[in-house]
Amino acid sequence: MAVAVGRPSNEELRNLSLSGHVGFDSLPDQLVNKSTSQGFCFNILCVGETGIGKSTLMDTLFNTKFESDPATHNEPGVRLKARSYELQESNVRLKLTIVDTVGFGDQINKDDSYKPIVEYIDAQFEAYLQEELKIKRSLFNYHDTRIHACLYFIAPTGHSLKSLDLVTMKKLDSKVNIIPIIAKADTIAKNELHKFKSKIMSELVSNGVQIYQFPTDEETVAEINATMSVHLPFAVVGSTEEVKIGNKMAKARQYPWGVVQVENENHCDFVKLREMLIRVNMEDLREQTHTRHYELYRRCKLEEMGFKDTDPDSKPFSLQETYEAKRNEFLGELQKKEEEMRQMFVMRVKEKEAELKEAEKELHEKFDLLKRTHQEEKKKVEDKKKELEEEVSNFQKKKAAAQLLQSQAQQSGAQQTKKDKDKKNPWLCTE
């Protein structure tokens, strides 16, 4: 029988019986129909070394062939490549995004290999937060790119986790749902595989790495999740090749020594991974991403912006009060900055004026020095000119005197010559 719940002013709840059918028992159907028409999105981050089988496992999980480019081991750094696909099963549409970590683990110095991954996850959170903070939000049409599940591919060494794996998972565990898996599990003997799993889980616990916990609080999935949790990390094998086994064709990897069936639970944990990731807990992964990881990021960002739920006295703070407080704080800082800039401008102007005055003084001094030098040089030139003029005048006088003496000498010589002639020819005179 349907039951109505009211909330009186005294906050006590009373159960009321309905006298007839109302219709809100169809709410689950309405929600299912609405969700089905909208479709779903699911974003998977694959973290692992180059060539460890990330693309093959994705193809096997979703029973299709996704686009993938062959990667080399020569990447200078880690970069993330995201590809989105539209899938449909029955009448349910799924927008699937697969993000690959290209070049992860290929560098000699692996200290910062996790940073591009963390930055990518934060960038998706930031994009969603910016959409939420818009005045006109459109979350209905927004393509949510937040990472819902991180499949962390562990190399099948059979010994222990690499330091790179521990550091990366520790940096990611507060930002994403980590599901550790052992890749290419068919390369490890079965007895060694159990020891390897135990060693991995022990190292994760001792290093404080928080991996995704399958929910056990819902009766419908509690039993299967509790059973599957003991198999972590899942040891998987991926293959899209069909091999004939008896009278049937099955996905498997064929070796000279035998066949490893992908969907045979005695051979690997692929079926367990698919059940846990897709069939049972896909919605919980989406919910955990929003309510846990995104909320943590959102809270930290809003606190950085100065938004808090309580004031220093632990009293509730309204959004309006927070806004006014931040606005006043911002205006105060703005006025302070303006005053600092004004003072700095005045100081710079004074410094410039002093520099200009000093430069002007130096120019005047240089001008006076040049003027004095010019006058001195002019005086020297004039004195030299006067000396030269006197020398020319004296030279002219001497020249005139010399010419006069020469002329007189010539005249005297001519007269003497005539006298001498007269003495030699006296008869000329008598005649």
UniProtKB/Swiss-Prot annotation:
Positions of the UniProt region annotated as G3 motif: 100-103
Region annotated G4 motif, chain positions: 183-186
Keywords: Acetylation, Cell cycle, Cell division, Cell projection, Coiled coil, Cytoplasm, Cytoskeleton, GTP-binding, Nucleotide-binding, Phosphoprotein, Synapse
Coiled coil: 320-408
Ranges for domain Septin-type G: 38-304
Gene Ontology process terms (BP): cytoskeleton-dependent cytokinesis; protein localization; regulation of synapse organization
Main location per the UniProt record: cytoplasm
Residues covered by region (Disordered): 400-431
Chain positions covered by the region annotation G1 motif: 48-55
Pfam family, one: Septin
Amino acids binding GTP: 48-55, 103, 184-192, 238, 253
Phosphoserine modification, residue list: 9
Top-level taxon of the source organism: Eukaryota
Record has Kinase as a keyword: no
Residue numbers bearing the N-acetylalanine modification: 2
Family: Belongs to the TRAFAC class TrmE-Era-EngA-EngB-Septin-like GTPase superfamily. Septin GTPase family.
Function according to Swiss-Prot or TrEMBL: Filament-forming cytoskeletal GTPase. May play a role in cytokinesis (Potential). May play a role in the cytoarchitecture of neurons, including dendritic arborization and dendritic spines, and in GABAergic synaptic connectivity.
Subunit structure: Septins polymerize into heterooligomeric protein complexes that form filaments, and can associate with cellular membranes, actin filaments and microtubules. Forms homooligomers. GTPase activity is required for filament formation. Interacts with SEPTIN7. Interacts with SEPTIN9 and SEPTIN12.
Protein name: Septin-11
